[in-house]
Structure formats: structure tokens, C-alpha cells
Amino acid sequence: MEVEKLALKYALINAIEHDGKANPKAVIGKILGENPELRKKAREIVPIVNKIVEEVNTLSLEEQKKKLEEIYPEYFMEGTKKEKEEKKQLPPLPKAEKGKVVTRFAPNPDGAFHLGNARAAILSYEYAKMYDGKFILRFDDTDPKVKRPELIFYDMIIEDLEWLGIKPDEIVYASDRLEIYYKYAEELIKMGKAYVCTCPPDEFRKLRDQGIACPHRDEPVEVQLERWKKMLNGEYREGEAVVRIKTDLNHPNPAVRDWPALRIVDEPNHPRTGNKYRVWPLYNFASAIDDHELGVTHIFRGQEHSENETRQRYIYEYFGWEYPVTVHHGRLSIEGVILSKSKTRKGIEEGKYLGWDDPRLGTIRALRRRGILPEAIRELILEVGLKKSDATVSWDNLAAINRKLVDPIANRYFFVADPIPMYIEEAEEFEAKIPLHPDHPERGYRVLKFEPGKPIYVSKDDLSLLKPGGFIRLKDLFNVEILEVGDTIKARFHSHEYEVARKNKWRMIHWVPEGKECEVIIPEGEELIIRKGLLEKNANVKEGEIVQFERFGFVRIDKIENDKVIAIYAHK
């Protein structure tokens, strides 16, 4: 197909999908991406595309559609990009009404949140958005003893959610709501649906396991209220009294029988409330009250937490409330990657991990640092969807999604790991002009200069391709014959033409004339492998940028210090 016809086709498609205005850069990228043989003619193609895009943009949207139907009717059979994306929507929610759906994500700020947590966050947010509803971020921070919240993690979670494209309509801190929990606890005691138990924990456990009532269970409400006041005013110490919700003492799951709702923590030293409060609600009590108070209509909950609903329904039944629709999903994990907050914390404290963003981990911060885009995480989670079974994805699954997203945006550079000098005889000075991206000539070029008498550097990884008497092509430079291989390599210029190398099936390797020091950190299971080498001297990379080191892989530039570049390997 002639370039003009291709340009017209893609200009019309791009215009129709973008309110009648085509983008010449996008059209050029599409033409070269699907027709790589035209890349060598990129300079000639650009003015042709610019002219056709200008003409297409003068047409009305209806005229553009009519013209495209004449030259490419298949487009309308396939459906537009937008229509295709809409087909990938999540399944409808039960009992969901437009404008009335309220969802929540309730992380404990005792550590950075990870891919597994992100599933509930993304599903909750996407469904709220789908139904023009409301998404609440509720910090579940009422355990100042076992899962102690820390101020740094409140901010981390908000930042990570924003990076994932999740903007809460409301942020709620459970630790700000203790007076509300106290009010409902007292009401339940007055209703005879809760009581204050002062049994030693072991003694209560024995009674519970036998389905026998605790001696305090059926004592008068007045006695219970007196004990409740003692809990609040400090007359009971930690472990001496607990508020329990009355349930079925013969329930098949002993953990459901008269479960604990509030307990005493003598010196909570809470990061937000200090030691102001000493009676703290447990998760199921605080969560049940807040879901009602905040008007939550739909809860997305891991299958492993399904018993929470059983406990919480007792409170809803006692108050005559309607329990939110609960959607259970399985766990999500990555093969060989640690998601456990307790294991991560222990590893950090022992010096095993560098921090919550150590690239070996599965925290959102670690994935971000490694070069995974937020869109890749969202796409992965939406693909898995609401499956009730546990899902373990391989790193390759996530990498494949990410590769598709980063490939069009990542500029290309040469990085030579473990460099070995190569001296080339009989070669004249030559400048290799290489596009920053093969599909986007409009981004510009990088120039690598070969100077006679000076070495270039090739990677030790390519030594097996270098045999005396053999030939190779130096990518975007010229072809050489290998003369000697040792601590240095000697070669002789052969020819410039790529066709010569292609015809003879000579292997192609990358190189740098001189370079800036560069280290690539490669996560491999529990290890961090460091590859040292040289990056193109004039590589204009910035911290946080994702680029491709050709023949090596996609990396994220982590740090630049004193002209030394440190990158983290993402994937091939």
C-alpha cells in the first residue's frame, strides 16, 4: 500500500477516535509500527503525513466517517477503540443503582500496601466510578498494640492510591471515631445484646469451645453498664475486661461465639490520638459500625475474610440495619514475590530488604520503583476481576502487560554490561545516527561517534559470538571481521551495509564508543544482582524515567549521582 493511502487511513481513524482531530505524530507512529520496512524512509514520510492530517482535520466528523467507510469499511465492522474497551468492563454489581453505590477501601496503615491489597482498592474504586457513586478511603487504625499504625504509612497509602489513579471522595480515620463506637457499644449493652466479660482469656476460651455461657453474660444491664464505665475510666487494666457481642453459643465456628468487640490498651501511644483513649474497638466492631454510618452499599472482601460478615451481621440484626452487599474475591499474589507485611517488616528490620520499596517486594512502591506502570497493575487486576478462587500470577504475566504499555513510550539506549574494549583496524571516522525510538522519529536521534585509534566497548555477554575469523555487525555502525579475542578484542572493518550482514546472517551486537558509568540492579528472587557497565555518554536520561537498554531490557532510572546512572531492571 502506498504511503499516502496508509496515511489517509490512519489519519481518518485517529481523527474519528479523537473528536475529529488527528495527531500527525500518532499517525506516523502507527504507520512505522505496522510497517517497519518504511522506517528508513521516515524523513520522507513525515511531510506527507503532515499534509494529509491537515486535510483530514478540515473535514467534519461525519465527512471523516464517510471517507473512511469508502476506503476501509472493515473499521466499522471491528468497532471503534472506545467500543472495544467498553466490552472489557467489569460485570454488573448486584443491587446496584446509578448514583447510589458507595464503596470503601479499609487498609491498616501499619505498612505499605501491596498488589494483593490493590485488588480490593481498584475494584472498589472502579465500581463506584462505573455507577457514578462514592469511594471512601477508611483507615482501619484502631489496633495500637498488635498492628500498630504509623504516620508515614497513612501518607504512603494515599500517595500509592493516587499513583494508581484512585482519588477518594472521602477519607475517614477510624481512630477519630472512638466516641461513635462507644455510643453504639453502650446502646448494645442497654439492649442486652452485648456484655462486659472479665473472665481470664484462657478461661473464656474453654467455656466458649464447649458452648457454655460466660458467668457474666446474663448479668443485669445495670451491672454491665457499671463495668463498661470502669473500662472507660481506667479501673480495669489491660486484659481484665472486654466487651463481647452476644451471638449463638452453638455456632459451628467457635470464633463467632460471643466475639470480642472492644478491649483495653493501657498505653496505646497512638500516632494520631496518643494516650487519650484506652478502650479500643476490634476490627469487626469498628468496621460494622462505620459501614452503616458511612452508607456503604457494597463491600469487596477477600474470600479468606468471609467470616467477618457472619460476625458483623449480628450487630446489623440487633439494630435493624440492612447489611451491605458483599462481593468476595480470592487472594492475588505474584509467584516468588513476598506480599506479607509482617515478613516485609521483619526483613527490613533485619537489613535483608532496603525498605518498603525494595524492588524484590510486591508493594505498590516496589513495583513503581521497578518500572511497572499503574495502568499495568490496573489492567492485571481488572483481568482477574471478581474470581472467588485465589489467583497467582507470574512475573511474566505482569511484565507482558507492562511491556505493551512501556514499549511505545520508552526511548532506546545502548548499555554495555561488563565492557570489553574492541580496537578496529582500517575503519574511518563514522557517526551512527540512531532514533531515540524506532517508531517515533519525531522524538529525535542520538549520535554515537566512532574515532579511528580509539576503542569501542562491547559486552562480555557477547563474547560467545566473537570468534577469530568470524564476522559481526555493530548495530547501526558497520560490519567487522574478528581478528583476536582476549582481554581486548581486535577487529577489522569489513563493510558499511546492513544488507551484507543480513545476507550472510551475521549476528548483531550493540556497543558504545565511550560511556558514563552505569549500574543496573536486577531483582532475582531474594537476591539483588548488580550489573556494572557503560551507558551512552550523551544519554539524556532522567530519574524516574523508564527506558529500554537495547538487547538488555526495560529499566527505570532510579538515581543519577556524579554522572553515574543507577537503574533498576524491570523486564525484557
Curated annotation (Swiss-Prot):
Catalytic activity, reaction form: tRNA(Glu) + L-glutamate + ATP = L-glutamyl-tRNA(Glu) + AMP + diphosphate
A GO-annotated cellular component: cytosol
Family matches, as HAMAP family: Glu_tRNA_synth_type2
Lineage: Archaea, Methanobacteriati, Methanobacteriota, Thermococci, Thermococcales
Compartments, record wording: Cytoplasm
Primary location recorded for the protein, binned into one broad class: cytoplasm
E.C. designation(s): 6.1.1.17
Record keywords: Aminoacyl-tRNA synthetase, ATP-binding, Cytoplasm, Ligase, Nucleotide-binding, Protein biosynthesis
Name of this chain's protein: Glutamate--tRNA ligase
Motif ('HIGH' region): 107-117
InterPro entries with a match to the protein in the record: Gln/Glu-tRNA_Ligase (IPR050132), Glu-tRNA-synth_arc/euk (IPR004526), Glu/Gln-tRNA-synth (IPR000924), Glu/Gln-tRNA-synth_Ib_cat-dom (IPR020058), Glu/Gln-tRNA-synth_Ib_codon-bd (IPR020059), Rbsml_bL25/Gln-tRNA_synth_N (IPR020056), Ribosomal_bL25/Gln-tRNA_synth (IPR011035), Rossmann-like_a/b/a_fold (IPR014729)
GO biological process, one term: amide biosynthetic process
Family statement drawn from the similarity comment of this UniProt entry: Belongs to the class-I aminoacyl-tRNA synthetase family. Glutamate--tRNA ligase type 2 subfamily.
Functional summary from the UniProt entry: Catalyzes the attachment of glutamate to tRNA(Glu) in a two-step reaction: glutamate is first activated by ATP to form Glu-AMP and then transferred to the acceptor end of tRNA(Glu).
Top-level taxon in the UniProt lineage: Archaea
Organism: Pyrococcus furiosus (strain ATCC 43587 / DSM 3638 / JCM 8422 / Vc1)
GO molecular function, one term: ATP binding
Gene, per the UniProt record: gltX
